[in-house]
């Protein structure tokens, strides 16, 4: 009876008019009733079992809180939520989940042993992940009940959540249905349904999801132990690791954003799924703030700016690759020139390496084993024929499978190893802007942020262990200098040895200590991500923040102990013995294309002068001044500045000035009869600040100075 009451109370007026699958069904389908009935039966047994354990083992446990405070609790009885209420009512209201001994934990799940306890709120990345994961369960419940959906997967993402579900071979969800589905989700949150965590055996899981082939596949593929967890919430029962919110009422504001299709791939033919994406917050006020932020972000979308300013475009005949138009190429080249100038005085040597390599190289480096699916491999013509015995090594056809390089490091190792090296050559800093190719899935492509073909400001430093700390400090200084010019703040994180690391633990300890010391001396705040390093070495991740406060991981500093071993890299030390160098992977911009997109959004298309594809427009007052205007334009171009001419006689002077401001030209040189006679220009900025009359050569020289110093506010300090 409880199920039928829940089903009825969740039905909304108007659903039948929207023609949603089960809107006219007054009772739940048989499979749902059976699934929920089995869940309730297993839940009752679990509650009884836990109560029995708490009675049999009534023991006190010690709970350690951040800051050193310790609290007594009762094993199998006390929950993190109860402790939060003891500490503060505000904490109890704002906590979304807990961390117990570093692992995510439900607030209503009893503690079992002595533990370190930390509470997660929505303000933390971990808290947001829990909050949005719970929200996708709400979306799944709504889709299941009112669309007749067969649920597939519903993760949280960096900026919200989505749920994939199956509606049949022909059925898709229409955009017009999203508002109704959103309203259903809001009703489910208002009902404040609790999330209940259940441990079930593999056989029980198969019974619970016997009518859902997607969940059955996940059970066989992902569940490796004797049990796994499912969560119940209202009429929803879903396979899930958790944790979740205490109840759906903690979701104060929820909005569905988009619908699209996705693919489910298993051993059979791919199934087309429907994907609905959304966002949620603890309060409606936070949702309103986010909506205003999103409106601003859409105005700053780099794809929109790229189209309006004619910087770049994409074409279906080259998916995942960008076509940079002349103005976009100007910005691109200015960024690369900036890094090249830094390389020149920081002791880096730029090199060029091939794009195609035999897969033997990638097997030697280890990338073929771990990265093969993300690489483009090609079979050269005639590769099925053995090379002629008459040909020598220089003309023999290579019969190996070839692959486009997704990174430069193995090529730089070949470059280091191609001749004997001495300690006097170290540190050897090799920089490479070569094109990289990665086989990104078509669904993951998006503007400049994820491409199949791109360039990086990629460099590798080969040094001795004694030089390591100084090189790391130099890399950090490089980052700070570049990001300061670009106007980005940033946050550093040290990722240390993971469980599956390779190499000598003592070497890892030594390297991690060097990185910690370098970060300490660098003076910027940093976080420690224990166990989050790559298997081949610890790393420093760099998260920059744009004008909208969004984080972007672009730069990196990565130590590598494995490639020098795999390529047997050696140099002759001061004592004459052969020694192994340390390898540092480092990038500041990361993908140049991606960083250009981040910059476009951060400045909203108002480029700083040194990067701007719209530096100066010369505007003659009348046709009589057009020749002098062309002369002024030529002077600007001869000085290496981007200059355009607007002599459109069909528009008034004020209309042309306004057009230049809307196009975000940094400066406008207006020339009339007086300016022509005196060989001067009248200067305005894009914000309509009037700088007055300047001699043409002096104005050009001042712009060159401002461009060369890469100031962010040339219009203000002209």
From Swiss-Prot:
It comes from the Eukaryota. PROSITE patterns: AA_TRNA_LIGASE_II, TGS. It catalyses: tRNA(Thr) + L-threonine + ATP = L-threonyl-tRNA(Thr) + AMP + diphosphate + H(+). Its EC number is 6.1.1.3. One of its GO terms (cellular component) is mitochondrial matrix. Residues 55-121 form the TGS domain. It is found in: Mitochondrion matrix. Keywords: Aminoacyl-tRNA synthetase, ATP-binding, Disease variant, Ligase, Mitochondrion, Nucleotide-binding, Phosphoprotein, Primary mitochondrial disease, Protein biosynthesis, Transit peptide. GO terms for molecular function: aminoacyl-tRNA deacylase activity; ATP binding; protein homodimerization activity; threonine-tRNA ligase activity. The modification Phosphoserine is found at residue 52. Pfam families: HGTP_anticodon, TGS, tRNA-synt_2b, tRNA_SAD. The keyword DNA damage does not apply. GO terms for biological process: mitochondrial threonyl-tRNA aminoacylation; threonyl-tRNA aminoacylation. The keyword Protein biosynthesis applies. It is linked to Combined oxidative phosphorylation deficiency 21: A mitochondrial disorder characterized by a lethal encephalomyopathy. Shortly after birth, affected individuals manifest axial hypotonia, limb hypertonia, psychomotor delay, and increased serum lactate. Additional features include subsarcolemmal lipofuscin-positive deposits in muscle, cerebral spongiosis, and hepatic steatosis. Catalyzes the attachment of threonine to tRNA(Thr) in a two-step reaction: threonine is first activated by ATP to form Thr-AMP and then transferred to the acceptor end of tRNA(Thr). Also edits incorrectly charged tRNA(Thr) via its editing domain. Homodimer. Belongs to the class-II aminoacyl-tRNA synthetase family. This is Threonine--tRNA ligase, mitochondrial. The lineage of its organism: Eukaryota, Metazoa, Chordata, Craniata, Vertebrata.
């Amino acid at each position: 009876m409880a199920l039928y009451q829940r089903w009825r109370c969740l039905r909304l007026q108007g659903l039948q008019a929207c023609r949603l699958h089960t809107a006219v069904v007054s009772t739940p389908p048989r499979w749902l009733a059976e699934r929920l009935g089995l869940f309730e039966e297993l839940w009752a047994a679990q509650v009884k079992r836990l109560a029995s354990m708490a009675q049999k083992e009534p023991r006190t446990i010690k709970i350690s809180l951040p800051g050193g405070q310790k609290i007594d609790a009762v094993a199998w009885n006390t929950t993190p939520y109860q402790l939060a209420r003891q500490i503060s009512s505000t904490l109890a209201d704002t906590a979304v989940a807990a961390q117990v001994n570093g692992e995510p934990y439900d607030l209503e799940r009893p503690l079992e042993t002595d533990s370190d306890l930390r509470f997660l709120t929505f303000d933390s990345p971990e808290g947001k992940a829990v909050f949005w994961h719970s929200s996708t369960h709400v979306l799944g419940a709504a889709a299941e009940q009112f669309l007749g959906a067969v649920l597939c997967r519903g993760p949280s993402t960096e900026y919200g959540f989505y749920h994939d579900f199956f509606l049949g071979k022909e059925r898709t969800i229409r955009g017009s249905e999203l508002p109704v589905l959103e309203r259903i989700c809001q009703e489910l949150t208002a009902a404040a349904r609790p999330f209940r965590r259940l441990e079930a055996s593999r056989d029980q899981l198969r019974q619970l999801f016997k009518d859902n082939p997607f969940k059955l596949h996940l059970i066989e593929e992902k569940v490796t132990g004797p049990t796994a967890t499912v969560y119940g919430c209202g009429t929803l029962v879903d396979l899930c690791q958790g944790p979740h919110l205490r109840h759906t009422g903690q979701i104060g504001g929820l909005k569905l954003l988009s619908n699209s299709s996705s693919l489910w791939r298993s051993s059979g033919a791919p199934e087309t799924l429907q994907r609905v994406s959304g966002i949620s917050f603890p309060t409606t006020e936070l949702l309103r703030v986010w909506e205003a932020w999103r409106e601003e972000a859409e105005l700053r979308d780099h794809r929109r700016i790229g189209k309006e300013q004619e910087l770049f475009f994409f074409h279906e005949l080259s998916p995942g690759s960008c076509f940079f138009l002349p103005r976009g190429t100007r910005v691109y080249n200015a960024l690369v020139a900036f890094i090249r100038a830094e390389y020149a005085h920081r002791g880096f040597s730029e090199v060029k390496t091939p794009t195609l390599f035999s897969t033997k190289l990638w097997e030697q480096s280890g990338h073929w084993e771990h990265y093969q699916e993300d690489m483009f491999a090609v079979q050269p013509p005639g590769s099925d024929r053995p090379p002629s015995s008459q040909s020598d090594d220089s003309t023999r056809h290579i019969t190996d499978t070839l692959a486009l390089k997704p990174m430069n490091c193995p090529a730089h190792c070949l470059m280091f190893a191609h001749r004997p090296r001495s300690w006097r050559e170290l540190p050897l800093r090799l920089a490479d802007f070569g094109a990289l190719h990665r086989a990104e899935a078509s669904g993951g492509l998006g503007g400049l942020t994820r491409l199949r073909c791109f360039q990086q400001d990629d460099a590798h430093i080969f040094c001795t262990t004694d030089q390591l700390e100084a090189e790391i400090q130099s890399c950090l200084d490089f980052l700070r200098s570049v990001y300061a010019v670009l106007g980005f703040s940033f946050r550093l994180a040290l990722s240390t040895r993971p469980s599956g690391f390779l190499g000598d633990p003592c070497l890892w300890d030594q390297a991690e200590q060097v990185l910690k010391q370098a970060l300490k001396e660098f003076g910027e705040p940093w976080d420690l991500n224990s166990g989050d390093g790559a298997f081949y070495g610890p790393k420093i991740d760099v998260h920059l923040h744009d004008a909208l406060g969004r984080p972007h991981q672009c730069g990196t500093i990565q130590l590598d102990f494995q490639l020098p071993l795999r390529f047997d890299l050696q140099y002759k030390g001061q004592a004459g013995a052969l020694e192994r160098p340390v390898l540092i992977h480092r990038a500041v911009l990361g993908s140049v294309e991606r960083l250009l997109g981040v910059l476009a959004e951060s400045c909203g298309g108002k480029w700083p002068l040194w990067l701007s594809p719209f530096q100066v427009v010369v505007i003659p007052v009348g046709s009589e001044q057009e020749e002098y205007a062309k002369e002024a334009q030529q002077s600007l171009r001869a000085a290496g500045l981007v200059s355009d001419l607007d002599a459109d006689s069909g528009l008034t002077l004020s209309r042309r000035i306004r057009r230049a401001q809307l196009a975000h030209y940094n400066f406008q040189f207006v020339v009339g009869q007086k300016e022509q006679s005196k060989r001067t220009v009248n200067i305005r900025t894009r914000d309509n600040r009037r700088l007055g009359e300047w001699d043409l050569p002096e104005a050009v020289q001042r712009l060159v100075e401002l461009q060369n110093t890469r100031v962010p506010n040339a219009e203000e300090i002209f």
